[in-house]
Amino acid sequence: MAGHTGTDHTGPDHTDASHSGAVRIGTSGWSYDHWEGVLYPPGLPGRDRLAHYAARFDTVELNASFYRWPRAETFAGWRRRLPEGFAMSVKAPRGLTHGKKLYAPEVWAERITRCWHELGDKRAVLLVQLPPDFARDDARLDYFLAALPGWIRVSVEFRHPSWDDAGVYALLERHGAAYCVMSGAGLPCVLRATAPFVYVRLHGPDPDVLYGGSYSDDDLRWWAGRIGEWRAAGKDVFAYFNNDGGGSAVRNAATLRGLLGESLPW
C-alpha cells in the first residue's frame, strides 16, 4: 500500500510487554494558514493556534526549531501554557544536524539540555533528522548520543541509505535511541524498534511529492495495526503526520486516533 513499502526488521524487546504502551498521534507543526476551516476557525489569531490545537490533540512535533532554535524562556512558556498531559517533540537545529553533521556537539548538547529542563513535563522526544548527504559515520553518531544526558529521549531520522545496517541499529539500542520509522516520497520504511519507544513520521503517500497527498483509509488501518503491535509490546509510540497540505495531516491524524480507539474531543 502507498506510504509503507519497505523492510520489516525486528529487534530486541527493551520493554515490559505485561503492560501496554501509550500512544500519541499528532502533526508536524501547527501554525499553518491553510488549516483555517480544517482545524482552526477563520480569523483565529496565530497566537491562539497552539492552544486550539492542544485542545484537540495531545502531542505535536515542533519543526520551527530546525530553522531557529527557541530561547529557554520560550520552552518555559510552553511548559506553563500547554495543558496537563500534552507532550511536545522538538526537531533538532539544522546548524547541528546539517551544518556540522553532529561534529563537536557539546555546545548544542548543553543548550538543548537546558531547554529540555525548561520544557519540563511537556517534553516528548528530540528528533534528530540527518541530511541525505550525510553517509554512515558510527563514531560521530555514537559521540553525539553520548553527549546528551540519558533522560532525553532521542529519535534519529536517517536520509542516507548507508545507515540502514544492523550495526547502526545496535548503536542506537546501546544508547536507548529510537530509529525514526518513516513513510512517504521514496524514503525507506524500516519497521525497526531500537528503544523503549517508537517514533514515526508520516510524510505523505504521494510517491513524487514530499509532504503531499492524504493517506487512504486502508493505509491508516495498516499503520494502526503496526502501532497497535508496538503498543501491545509495551512500547510508547509517538506518530506525527507531516503532509500538511490541504489539512491532510489533521484529518489523517484524527482518523488514525479513532482507529486506535483514542477518544477525540472534537
Model-found features: residue ranges?
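Residues lining hydrophobic/aromatic ligand-binding pockets adjacent to catalytic sites
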Residues: 1-266
